Amino acid sequence: MEKRLIIAVVLSIGVLYAYSFIFPTPKPVPTPGGKQAAMSSATAPAPSVAALPIAGTTPVAAPAPQAGQAPAVAKDVTVDTDLYTAVFSTQGGGLKKFVLKKYKETAGPQGKDIVLVNETAANRYALLSDSREFGISPNALYSASTGEVKVTDGGKGSLELTTTTSQGITFRKVYTFSGDAYRIGLTEEVQNVGNVALTGAVHLLQTSRVVDAKKEGRYEVYSPSTLAEGKVKLDDLEDLQKTPVQYGKDIAWSAFADKYFVDGIIADKGSISQVRITRPANDAILRDVASPTVSVAPGQRSAINYAIYYGPKDLDILKLQGSRFEEVIDYGWFGPIAKPLIYSLKFLYKYTGNYGIAIIIITFILKLVFFPLTHKSYKSMKDMQKLQPKMTELKEKFKNDRDAMNRAVMELYKTHKVNPLGGCLPMLVQIPVFFGLYRALMYSIELRHAPFYLWITDLSAKDPYYVTPIIMGATMFIQQKMTPTNMDPVQAKMMLMLPIVFTFMFLNFPSGLVIYWLVNNVLTIAQQMYINKTVE
């Protein structure tokens, strides 16, 4: 009996510890006020690359005219596609606004479009370029090839921004757009129109803003990440306030993601030689992406290519970007389980039109898959229950000799071919599936604002009235009452506390996950009724 209790307690503690370890409470992110979307990107002050600040901001004065240029006034260029609206500025050649058309801040028809970038100060624009060697300033004024770009369906469009530096360099930034893709091409071209050969690197400055947004879940986090040397490197926001992070080998991309959206710079044929990540202000993460060093002789030119991504953390869309960009979604250890579950949910959604129904179907399928293990588990518990009288006799017989009692109990197990752990081990196999599904539901953009029925309007958010977790706790209680046990009454009462513990744990879980666990419990009760009739 003690072994059963110890195993149950250890499993319960293990689940709670695993819960805390896998889903740690995120560190608070103090930021200035202002309600914005869950993730907003902008560019922090862009000083010279050799002396990037660790904290604080510095206002940027109005830029002086570049050599060979007449004074000019900065203008906006609007790019409109089926998926987003972007606004670029001729000051700095950067991005000042980016709005997603397919995603809303809140559920329902009144929800506003998600805004990923929205800056009014020129020193906060995204995608600014800087190079001390070539005289390229993040504050330079550019001439634009057009005042507006409109791309629909599968069409293509481009925007060319050009400036000339005092070092005799004509610098071009060419953005290319597709009407049906979030991917934006960026070519930075250095043309030497002077008389002296120049050597240097061009830095692309990309800051992602960390905003004090309303969290949709307790475990929503912000995280800069970089794929370098074949591994995804995650950086802690608080650590970045103290110490910058730098990567300089085999860099495929650098990104910043929140729960549902991401901005990233993806290398093209080794176009990123170094990434330096700092936190120049509480509300910003600065990524200084440096190109390889290039030498440009008089009359020659050199081009550096990138892919820019602003959009949803949709597994299929991210995979299309190449360079393992889909790994910007951090599923932790349960990625091999979470990804197939996401693809399965998407497949079922095509036929059901409701992700809640898709989750229920997935639950049925998983129950069928695990039926042999569950059946074996309950059969083992039944067998243990039958041996309870004999175990009580052995305990009484060898009450003064624990070693002899243990040997006798093990011999009893061997004689009746009973595995004392047979009731627990099959259950342990299902725990990774539970956590994998948790990750899939928590970070799947498809479930964001996806309704089920009645009061459940967002399967990625908690049940607003806590109805489903309470019912789930009740079914767990019924399930435990039906489960064979060889515990004494006191131990059994202790185990009945587990449904209460799990109910409180599930109160703030995504409603889609609670539906899975609730349906799973109902199916388990039906299965237990069947086993109780067939296994005697």
Swiss-Prot record:
Assembly description: Interacts with the Sec translocase complex via SecD. Specifically interacts with transmembrane segments of nascent integral membrane proteins during membrane integration.
CDD domains noted in UniProt: 5TM_YidC_Alb3 (cd20070), EcYidC-like_peri (cd19961)
Protein task: Required for the insertion and/or proper folding and/or complex formation of integral membrane proteins into the membrane. Involved in integration of membrane proteins that insert both dependently and independently of the Sec translocase complex, as well as at least some lipoproteins. Aids folding of multispanning membrane proteins.
Family, as annotated: Belongs to the OXA1/ALB3/YidC family. Type 1 subfamily.
Subcellular location(s) of the protein: Cell inner membrane
Protein name (record): Membrane protein insertase YidC
GO molecular function, one term: membrane insertase activity
Record organism: Geobacter sp. (strain M21)
Main location: membrane
Keywords, comma-separated and alphabetical: Cell inner membrane, Cell membrane, Chaperone, Membrane, Protein transport, Transmembrane, Transmembrane helix, Transport
GO cellular component, one term: plasma membrane
Bilayer disposition of the protein: Multi-pass membrane protein
GO biological process: protein insertion into membrane; protein transport
NCBIfam families: PRK01318.1-3, yidC_nterm, yidC_oxa1_cterm
Pfam families to which the protein is assigned, alphabetical: 60KD_IMP, YidC_periplas
TM region positions: 5-25, 353-373, 418-438, 495-515
